[in-house]
Swiss-Prot record:
It comes from Pectobacterium atrosepticum (strain SCRI 1043 / ATCC BAA-672) (Erwinia carotovora subsp. atroseptica). HAMAP family: MQO (MF_00212). The keyword Signal does not apply. This is Probable malate:quinone oxidoreductase. SUPFAM superfamilies: FAD/NAD(P)-binding domain. InterPro entries: FAD/NAD-bd_sf (IPR036188), MQO (IPR006231). GO terms for biological process: tricarboxylic acid cycle. GO terms for molecular function: 2-hydroxyglutarate dehydrogenase activity; L-malate dehydrogenase (quinone) activity. Coiled coil: none annotated. The gene is mqo. NCBIfam families: mal_quin_oxido (TIGR01320), PRK05257.1-1 (NF003603), PRK05257.1-4 (NF003605), PRK05257.2-1 (NF003606), PRK05257.2-4 (NF003608), PRK05257.2-5 (NF003609), PRK05257.3-2 (NF003611), PRK13339.1 (NF009875).
C-alpha cells in the first residue's frame, strides 16, 4: 500500500510540474483600465472615444495578426460602402398591400451621419489625416429590371421623398438618363428590357482599413495605450473583484502566455467575438450562436473599364439571401487608385475569420445554442437553398451574374478575389426556438464590465454610432455626467437629435462633414 501511495505521489508530481511551470509562465503583465480585443474598426473607434472622454484611462489593444485592420476591416475584405440606405433595397422591404416602410432605412441613414461627424471631428483634431485616403464621394445607385422590380423601386423612391434625408435623390426609368449615370450598365443591354434606377449623388466609398490604421496610430501616441500584435486571446475569466483576466499568447515568442487584468473588456474581434464571449462565462452569451458566410468578388483594374464607371450600383437580393449578398458593381478606391468590384458571391467555410480555424463553427456549438441553431436551419430553407446555389457556382455562373449588370464585360478583364468571413447571429427565441439576426448586436454582462459586438451588416460604416450605443449601455453613469455629455456633443454635434425632418440641422451637419471630409454636398430644401 505504501509503495502504491508513493508511486501515486510521484506520478502526481510529474504530472503537476508542467502545469505549475505553465502557470508560472502566465505572468500578469499589467493591470489596465480597458482591454480591447481585436484591432479592427470597432475596437479602434471605441478606443478613440474613450481617449477623448476619459484620457486618464489606460487602454490595451490585443490583436492576433501582425498588424491592425487585417481581417474584416481590411479594404479588400469588405465592400467599402458607406451604408446610408440610399441604394440598399433590403432596408426597405416591398409591401404590395401598402406604402413601403422606410423606418429601417432612416435608422441606417441617421447612423452613417453620426459616423461622418465622428470622422470629421478626428480630422479637425489631427487624429485622421488626408480624408481622401479613406473616404470619397461615389454616387449610390439602385438598379432593377422587370415590371415588378421597377414598380417597387418607384414606390420606394416615392416613400423616401417624405423624408428630408433623401432629398436630392433622382429616379428614372429612361434608358438614356440611366446611361448617363452608368454607361457600362446600359451598353449592350436589351433595349426592350424594362429598367429603373435611383441615384443619390452624396454616396460614399470608404476604406475602413485605412481609418482603423490611422485611429490606432493616433492612439499609440498616448503613453497609457499599449498595442499587442501577434497576440491571440486564449481565455477570459472574471476575478473575485469583478475585474477580468485576459490571457493571451505571444504567437511570435513560442506562444508564451501573459495575463492582463482589466476593469472593462470589449470583444471587437469580428467573427471570433462569439467564441471569446462564450469563454467569459457570462449567462448572456448562452443566448447566441453563429453561422459563418464568406464572400468572393470579381475584380478588374483595367483602367479603360474603371474610368467609365464611377458609382456603386446595387441590385435586388435573391429571395432568402442575407443582406451582405446583395449583388453590386462598385467603384472602390485603394491608395488613390480606383478599381471595380462585383459581387459578393457567398461561400461557405466553417471558419469564423478569414484567417481562422476550420473548427470555429463546431467549437462554438454549445448545449445552450444547439437547438436555436437547428431551428434557424429548419426555418430558413430559402437561405440554405441560396447558400447551396452560391457554393455550386462556377466561373461561368459568376461571369453570367456580372453580365446582368455589365452586359459587355469580358472574362479576361476580371479575376476572382476572396473577401472576409461574416458570422450571422443566431439568437435563442422563446416562440420560435431560434431566430436569425441580420444586423449587429451588442451583448454585455449585467454589470457592464464586459461587452462584445456580434453580427455583420451594416457593420463598419456604423462603427461610430454602434460604439456610442455601447458607451450608453456599459458606461451609463459616465455618459450622464456633464463632462461626457459636453465631449460627446463636441464629437457628434447632432448627438441626441434626429436629422430627419430637421432641415436646418441636416444642412448644418452635412455641410460641416462634407467640407471637412472633402465630399459632395447637396443642400436640403423645403418641399
Amino acid at each position: 500500500m505504501k509503495k502504491l501511495l508513493a508511486m501515486f505521489f510521484c506520478l502526481s508530481v510529474v504530472v503537476s510540474a508542467p502545469l505549475a511551470m505553465a502557470e508560472d509562465a502566465k505572468t500578469t503583465e499589467k493591470t489596465t483600465d480597458v482591454v480591447l480585443i481585436g484591432g479592427g474598426i470597432m475596437s479602434s473607434t471605441l478606443g478613440v472615444y474613450l481617449q477623448e472622454l476619459q484620457p486618464d484611462w489606460s487602454i490595451d489593444m490585443v490583436e492576433r495578426m501582425d498588424n491592425v485592420a487585417e481581417e474584416s476591416s481590411n479594404g479588400w475584405n469588405n465592400a467599402g460602402t458607406g451604408h446610408s440606405a440610399f441604394m440598399e433595397l433590403n432596408y426597405t422591404p416591398d409591401n404590395p398591400d401598402g406604402p413601403i416602410n422606410i423606418s429601417k432605412a432612416l435608422e441606417i441613414t441617421e447612423a452613417f451621419e453620426i459616423s461622418r461627424q465622428f470622422w470629421s471631428y478626428q480630422v479637425k483634431n489631427g487624429v485622421l489625416n488626408n480624408p481622401h485616403a479613406f473616404i470619397n464621394s461615389v454616387p449610390h445607385i439602385s438598379f432593377v429590371w422587370g415590371d415588378e422590380n421597377t414598380a417597387f423601386l418607384k414606390h420606394r423612391y416615392d416613400a423616401m421623398q417624405h423624408s428630408t434625408l433623401y432629398r436630392g435623390m433622382e429616379f428614372s426609368d429612361d434608358p438614356n438618363t440611366i446611361k448617363e449615370w452608368v454607361p457600362l450598365v446600359m451598353e449592350g443591354r436589351d433595349p426592350a428590357q424594362k429598367i429603373a434606377a435611383t441615384r443619390m449623388p452624396i454616396g460614399t466609398d470608404v476604406n475602413y482599413g485605412e481609418i482603423t490604421r490611422q485611429l490606432v496610430s493616433a492612439m499609440k501616441t498616448k503613453s497609457n495605450f499599449a498595442l499587442h500584435l501577434n497576440s491571440e486571446v486564449r481565455d477570459i475569466k472574471r476575478n473575485a473583484d469583478n475585474t477580468w483576466s485576459v490571457t493571451y499568447a505571444d504567437l511570435k515568442n513560442g506562444e508564451k502566455e501573459s495575463v492582463i487584468k482589466a476593469k472593462f473588456v470589449f470583444i471587437g474581434a469580428g467573427g471570433a467575438a462569439l467564441k471569446l464571449l462564450q469563454k467569459s462565462g457570462i449567462p448572456e452569451a448562452d443566448l447566441y450562436g453563429g453561422f459563418p458566410v464568406g464572400g468572393e468578388f470579381l475584380v478588374t483594374e483595367n483602367p479603360e473599364i474603371v474610368k467609365r464607371h464611377m458609382a456603386k450600383v446595387y441590385g435586388k437580393a435573391s429571395v432568402g439571401a442575407p443582406p451582405m449578398s446583395v449583388p453590386h458593381l462598385d467603384t472602390r478606391i485603394f491608395d488613390g487608385k480606383p478599381v471595380l468590384l462585383f459581387g459578393p458571391f457567398a461561400t461557405f467555410s466553417s471558419k469564423f475569420l478569414k484567417n481562422g480555424s476550420l473548427w470555429d463553427l463546431i467549437g462554438s456549438v454549445t448545449f445552450s445554442n444547439v437547438m436555436p441553431m437547428t431551428h434557424v436551419g429548419l426555418d430558413n430553407f430559402d437561405l440554405v437553398k441560396y447558400l447551396v446555389s452560391q457554393v455550386m457556382m462556377d466561373d461561368d455562373d459568376r461571369f453570367a451574374s456580372l453580365q446582368e449588370y455589365f452586359p459587355n464585360a469580358k472574362k479576361e478583364d476580371w479575376r476572382l478575389t476572396v473577401a472576409g468571413q461574416r458570422v450571422q447571429v443566431i439568437k435563442k427565441d422563446d416562440d420560435k426556438g431560434g431566430v436569425l439576426k441580420l444586423g449587429t448586436e451588442i451583448v454585455s454582462s449585467q454589470d457592464g464590465s464586459i461587452a462584445a459586438l456580434l453580427g455583420a451588416s451594416p457593420g463598419a460604416s456604423t462603427a461610430a454610432p454602434i460604439m456610442l450605443s455601447l458607451l450608453e449601455k456599459v458606461f451609463k453613469d459616465k455618459v450622464a455626467t456633464p463632462e461626457w455629455q459636453s465631449k460627446l456633443k463636441e464629437i457628434v454635434p447632432s448627438y441626441g437629435q434626429k436629422l430627419d425632418g430637421n432641415i436646418e440641422m441636416t444642412n448644418k451637419i452635412r455641410s460641416y462633414t462634407s467640407s471637412t471630409l472633402g465630399l459632395d454636398y447637396i443642400e436640403v430644401k423645403p418641399e
